[in-house]
Amino acid sequence: MSKKAVPPIVKAQYELYNRKLNRAIKVSGSQKKLDASFVGFSESSNPETGKPHADMSMSAKVKRVNTWLKNFDREYWDNQFASKPIPRPAKQVLKGSSSKSQQRDEGEVVFTRKDSQKSVRTVSYWVCTPEKSMKPLKYKEDENVVEVTFNDLAAQKAGDKLVSILLEINVVGGAVDDKGRVAVLEKDAAVTVDYLLGSPYEAINLVSGLNKINFRSMTDVVDSIPSLLNERKVCVFQNDDSSSFYIRKWANFLQEVSAVLPVGTGKSSTIVLT
């Protein structure tokens, strides 16, 4: 890739901004025809004061046009860019949590069941793929966006709860500073640069070296990876085709381990250490 060439991500950002700008100008014109006193959108100056905007950077311009569309063209914004409300299921309770629990080191919790004199320990563990080394992230010919799937991360046994997902991306080489992005897209969204840059969810900028991106749910634990991602998909955009991306995927699970307490039918005494 030539250093003088406009990176695809920069080009896509400008195209997306111009699409929003044209929409704001069009709506402003329509509203002024209905109401001459309507204050329309202006890219270069504050229409209320007439003074030029102090900050004309791309990020500032995007923020201004986004705010205007949210306030004056809400239906368009909601249809094109707004995120859907994230379901907030009730906080899940592990078996035995009705009794008093005691916090232990390294996040372990022990639940005591008085009826059966058993304890349930919740043990945290990680699984990863690939296990020994990272693997190259492969793209289709003439494409620079790829969806990352996590169906190869499996729990040790059915019923284990999922806490989080960790995606490691090692970026090697490249002619430009802007290496790429990691973004979350809706399930039905096309895996393209335009959809990735227009995603209403936070996008993570990638830098040279090792990047670690964590994905967690609104709740403490969930039953599966699709539940954690809320049926959405994770995509990686490579901005510079002269760089190489290597990935490894991790998943953190919780597992319940039962144990019978050493309680007999004979005399029982307790010594309290102070």
Curated annotation (Swiss-Prot):
Q: Where in the cell is it found?
A: Virion
Q: Does the keyword Transport apply?
A: no
User: From start to end residue, where is composition biased (Basic and acidic residues)?
Assistant: 102-113
Q: Which GO terms describe its cellular component?
A: viral capsid
- Please describe what this protein does: Capsid protein self-assembles to form a capsid about 33 nm in diameter. The capsid encapsulates two genomic RNAs as well as a third, subgenomic RNA (RNA3) (Potential).
Its name, as the record gives it, is: Capsid protein
Instruction: Check the record and name the InterPro entries matching this protein.
Output: RBDV_coat
Query: What ranges does the record give for the region Disordered, renumbered to this chain?
Result: 88-113
One Pfam family named in its UniProt record: RBDV_coat
Q: Which keywords appear in this protein's UniProt record, sorted alphabetically?
A: Capsid protein, Virion
